């Protein structure tokens, strides 16, 4: 049986962890996330320096690890709670749902509300102040659609790993 409170706690923890690591990167130096900014902004600011590329990799690693590992971990917990009886579709839906929760949060709260609507100064890359691309809601909607595909693939990977090893 599906444990909705457990799903909500896993989703909430995933969103909180991923958001914390992502905000750390942007607040530390928004240029570390330059690859995720709208193309119009990338065109008017200098490319990442070698040091920024190195920092993006090392400081971004915890975010990437959480992004990939947590949905799989949560799906293992879901399978254990189901006494190993959850079928592949249930495992996929659970892993997809966890990954999709952050995708939805990232799109509506982080991208549309914070990045596009509020646009904190800490998120603005020097040299791009006031650029209209900071209000490019469609750019972030496209990112959400890509994130939805990513969530579906993460669901398949997570379900496959748990079905084989769980």
Regions found by a protein language model. Name each.
Residues 1-97, 101-166:
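Juxtamembrane/disordered regions of integral membrane proteins
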């Amino acid at each position: 049986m599906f444990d909705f409170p457990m799903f909500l706690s896993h989703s909430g923890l995933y969103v909180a962890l991923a958001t914390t690591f992502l905000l750390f990167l942007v607040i530390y130096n928004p240029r570390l996330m330059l690859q995720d900014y709208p193309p119009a902004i990338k065109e008017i600011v200098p490319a990442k320096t070698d040091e920024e590329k190195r920092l993006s990799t090392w400081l971004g690693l915890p975010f990437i690890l959480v992004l990939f590992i947590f949905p799989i971990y949560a799906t293992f917990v879901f399978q254990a709670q189901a006494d190993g009886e959850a079928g592949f579709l249930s495992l996929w839906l659970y892993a997809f749902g966890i990954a999709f929760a952050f995708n939805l949060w990232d799109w509506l709260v982080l991208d549309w509300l914070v990045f596009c609507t509020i646009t904190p100064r800490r998120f603005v890359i020097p040299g791009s102040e006031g650029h209209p691309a900071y209000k490019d809601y469609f750019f972030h909607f496209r990112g959400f659609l890509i994130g939805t595909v990513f969530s579906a693939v993460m669901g398949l990977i997570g379900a496959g790993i748990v079905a084989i090893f769980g």
